[in-house]
Design a protein with these regions (language model features):
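Glycine-rich, acidic/polar active-site loops that bind/position phosphate-bearing ligands
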Residues: 1-335
Length: 335
């Protein structure tokens, strides 16, 4: 009897201002696990705000595959959305990456809240309004909430083969972070989106939701959620130098709107100049400065001004494809 495999096709819908993840399952016989074996598929774009009802077919082009850690004989297949004629759909952020190779390295720091649908607040949110401060990298039942959920997600990501480099509890209650490193903007974006999908699916089991909004608690004295992007190319890693790094930072400062436009919706609520952020209207960079737009890590300095920079402005709900594309574009324009 032929072995049956479950292929979960994942894509981004047309909702604005922040796209959501969608998925559906295809069953294949004698599937060996390669991307080349994954056929194009279609879906009803009129149900995802990506087409009109009278001409509703959109195409799914597989671009990334990994093991599905939650299913027997399962695979996760990240897809680009195409129009019926095969051209990139307007909602296809991956297609905005014009130049992509392994020379550009990306490390994303994905923050988010574990959200309790019953209270409509972060998991463990204090009734007595305990101020933040005790929750960052914390331990213990008074400080840390949802560790079992987080550990399960970490295991799922590792079992899927995603390059997660670490996790930690964040500054606000119920807020967590994981880090993913990959070479190439498309590969990094693929891994972030699949990891987000796994976070959502894992949370279902616990009756929880994942809140990607950058400031879900509004204008309160609680940190928002970002997705800091650490980046470098061969020139930054091999040549480096204070002049080169400053030159790149200055180029980012000349393109504030270009970056903010793709760094995530509602980011103005987070980038206020408070809570370890620079104002969305300003630009600054500095060594180890977590209140700057771009932080120059101490490790970069110690390595002779060689290595990575960290743009702290992207929000937790930002599209890593679009973020990677603009980081590459601006960095290259500085040379």
């Amino acid at each position: 009897m032929a072995t049956k495999s479950k292929l979960e096709y994942i894509w981004l819908d047309g909702f604005e201002p922040t796209q959501s993840l969608r998925s559906k399952t295809m069953i294949r016989s004698d599937f060996k696990g390669s991307l080349d074996e994954c056929p194009m598929w279609s879906f009803d774009g009129s149900s995802t705000l990506q087409a009109e009802g009278g001409d509703s077919d959109c195409l799914l082009k597989p671009v990334f595959i990994c093991q599905d850690p939650d299913r027997i004989n399962g695979y996760l297949v990240m897809c680009e959305v195409l129009n019926a004629d095969g051209s990139p759909h307007a909602t296809n952020g991956r297609a905005t990456i014009e130049e992509d190779d392994d020379d550009f390295w990306f490390g994303y720091e994905q923050e988010y809240f574990l959200w309790d649908p019953e209270t409509n607040l972060p998991l463990g949110f204090p009734r007595d309004q305990t101020p933040q401060g005790q929750f960052y990298c914390s331990v213990g039942g008074k400080n840390t909430f949802g560790r079992d959920v987080i550990e399960a997600h970490l295991d799922m990501c590792l079992d899927a083969g995603l390059n997660v480099e670490g996790i930690n509890a964040e500054v606000a209650v119920g807020q967590w972070e994981y880090q993913i490193f990959a070479k190439g903007a498309k590969e990094a974006g693929d891994q972030i989106w699949v990891s987000r999908y796994l976070a959502e699916r894992n949370a279902e089991k616990y009756g929880l939701a994942i809140e990607w909004h950058p400031k879900p608690l509004g204008p309160t004295d609680w940190n928002g959620s970002g997705m800091h992007v650490n980046f470098s190319d061969g020139r930054m890693r091999d040549e480096g130098g204070e002049k080169l790094m400053s030159q790149i930072c200055e180029a980012f400062g000349k393109n504030i709107k270009k970056h903010i436009d793709v760094y995530g919706a509602h980011n103005e609520q987070r980038l206020t100049g408070l809570h370890e952020t620079q104002s969305i209207h300003e630009f600054s960079y500095g060594v180890t400065d977590r209140g700057a737009s771009i932080r120059i890590p101490i490790g970069t300095i110690e390595d002779g001004w060689k290595g990575r920079l960290e743009d702290r402005r992207p929000s937790s709900n930002g599209d890593p494809y679009k973020i990677g594309a603009v980081v590459i574009s601006t960095t290259k324009s500085s040379y």
